[in-house]
Swiss-Prot record:
Naturally occurring in which organism (per UniProt): Halobacterium salinarum (strain ATCC 700922 / JCM 11081 / NRC-1)
Keywords: Arsenical resistance, Plasmid, S-adenosyl-L-methionine, Transferase
Biased composition (Low complexity): 40-65
Family affiliation: Belongs to the methyltransferase superfamily. Arsenite methyltransferase family.
Protein name as annotated: Arsenite methyltransferase
EC number: 2.1.1.137
Up-regulation conditions: By arsenite and antimonite.
Length: 391
């Protein structure tokens, strides 16, 4: 039986605070107190607080999320980013259908309403809990971020309309055969690239996927390494692990297993893995150096890293850095190329190569209807190698 040095950590408790918090404004929430005799647009706007009084019981992030009431026709993020910043001002800007993504309104879960804290100032445990809550909601929603097939049938142009035949995954670099080879339910459209394309996985190898989600990349890797190989998926969200394990039988993937754990504390034995892959997950980790350090630990000498992730190409505006949805939606947590190289070097890796993919701005620009995120982000391939042991 395989043993590992780091036990799976218990789910952290989210710290609470009594400081003023502003709830996210949408058509289906009621974050403002309305003065009698006025309509909703003239309402006096009073911020709600995480605790009504010093003696009241603090609310958890999940409780705060449940407190936001939603109607059947609710559309998350119904207000523009500028309107939210103005604390409730309306906007008549038309909302054009956009490519489904991690920030898609289809799969967006209600998150913590603390939009006053910069990413760098957030407690790591709070960040992990926010990410866990978001992707637990996606896992249990019964659909991927782009519906059944990743297409927006509403028309009006856009990359998911009838004007393109490519699915969301094909736009990320997968070919049609890749998509067709994996059973429904595993491809949730949560990536920003295709690690299989450059991981050079070989038959008989052991592959580890950091943040494996419902298992799409794991099942593709299983086809590459064959029955003599082994694939391990690690995810910190119990709901995702359950969904991935259900997909094992659907894909007849006996050489794939999924383990609950954090990618900074991998439940994997030392020097037991040939290849580490990941797809748009490392940016979500609040302590990235720890992720690379533990990745180095589990790799065999000569083992390699093949990661697809977003990298920051320009400084984020303050409202992006303070937006919880930007943090959990693979935007605000992105690092620069130089910072990533420094962290990989610090972990001990050699042959570090990070190649931004300029063409990725086409789909990244569609991640947010109110802002062109392609001005700040680009998808990149991240490759590195653990030095071989001298015999």
């Amino acid at each position: 039986m395989e043993l590992w040095t780091h036990p799976t950590p218990a789910a952290p408790r989210l710290a609470t605070s009594t400081r003023t918090r502003w709830r996210r404004t949408s058509r289906c929430s009621q974050p403002w107190a309305t003065t009698p005799g006025t309509n909703s647009s003239d309402a006096s706007r009073t911020p709600t607080t995480a605790s009504a009084s010093a003696t009241s019981k603090p609310q958890s992030a999940s409780a705060r999320a449940r407190s936001v009431r939603r109607s059947p026709d609710c559309t998350p993020r119904a207000w523009s980013r500028g309107a939210r910043k103005d604390r409730g001002a309306t906007t008549n800007r038309p909302r054009r259908p956009k490519f489904c993504s991690k920030r898609s309104t289809t799969c967006e879960a209600t998150m913590s309403n603390d939009n006053e804290t910069m990413v760098a100032d957030r407690d790591p445990e709070e960040t992990r809990e926010m990410v866990r809550e978001r992707y637990a909601g996606i896992a249990t929603s019964g659909q991927d971020c782009c519906g059944d097939v990743g297409l927006d049938v509403s028309g009006d142009g856009g990359c998911c309309s009838d004007e393109t035949e490519a699915s969301g995954s094909e736009r990320l670099g997968y070919d049609a055969d890749d998509v067709a080879s994996v059973a429904d339910g595993a491809d949730l459209g949560l990536g920003c690239g295709n690690p299989k394309a450059f991981a050079a996985m070989a038959p008989g190898e052991t592959v580890l996927d950091l943040g494996s989600g419902a298992g799409f990349d794991c099942f593709l890797a299983a086809q590459e390494v064959g029955p003599d190989g082994h694939v391990i998926g690690v995810d910190m969200t119990p709901e995702m692990i359950s969904k991935a394990r259900e997909n094992v039988a659907k894909n007849d993937a006996e050489n794939v297993e999924f383990r609950l754990g954090e990618i900074g504390h991998l439940p994997v034995a030392d020097e037991s893995v040939n290849v580490v892959i990941s797809n748009c997950v490392v940016n979500l980790a609040p302590e990235k150096q720890r992720v690379f350090d533990d990745t180095y630990r589990v790799l065999r000498p000569g083992g390699r890293v093949a990661i697809s992730d977003v990298v920051q190409t320009a400084p984020f505006p303050d409202d992006v850095q303070m937006d919880p949805d930007s943090l959990t939606g693979c935007v605000a947590g992105a690092s620069t190329v130089d910072d990533l190289k420094a962290m990989l070097d610090e972990a001990g890796f050699e042959a570090v190569e990070i190649a931004p993919k300029d063409e990725s701005t086409e789909f990244i620009s569609d991640w947010d209807a109110d802002r062109d995120l392609g001005e700040y982000l680009v998808s990149a391939t991240i490759e590195a190698r653990k030095p071989a042991r001298d015999d």
